[in-house]
């Protein structure tokens, strides 16, 4: 299917965001609500979540899928996050699994046939900023990279 914003028509949706009604109303289109997610419907009717709209990177179909593949195939990693660098290019941020060492040969072999990624930045798992629900704060990481001109 065609990629696009995921919108819902539901009696069970929220009516506002706490203390952020204007931001909520910006995402309401009549009876429809824009979830902030991005994806597509398969011909069989399955909804595929690809990314948050704010996290989209040009030439990457799905950051989430790419991160999942890298985590699944490279057992020395405990986290993979792909954010935009200051020029909008895909910048992997990776954390190593406990007691693991970076296997550069395996990394470069794995990403050779993927969309062009910059050399990953290694971070400790606990240093990757997260929300209270453990979601990685990609926009915060991008802002920090911009401050450091990385």
Regions found by a protein language model. Name each.
Residues 1-29, 59-61:
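Conserved ATP/PPi-binding loop(s) of AMP-dependent carboxylate-activating enzymes
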Residues 33-35, 123-124:
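Short, small/polar residue-rich loop motifs at catalytic or cofactor-binding pockets
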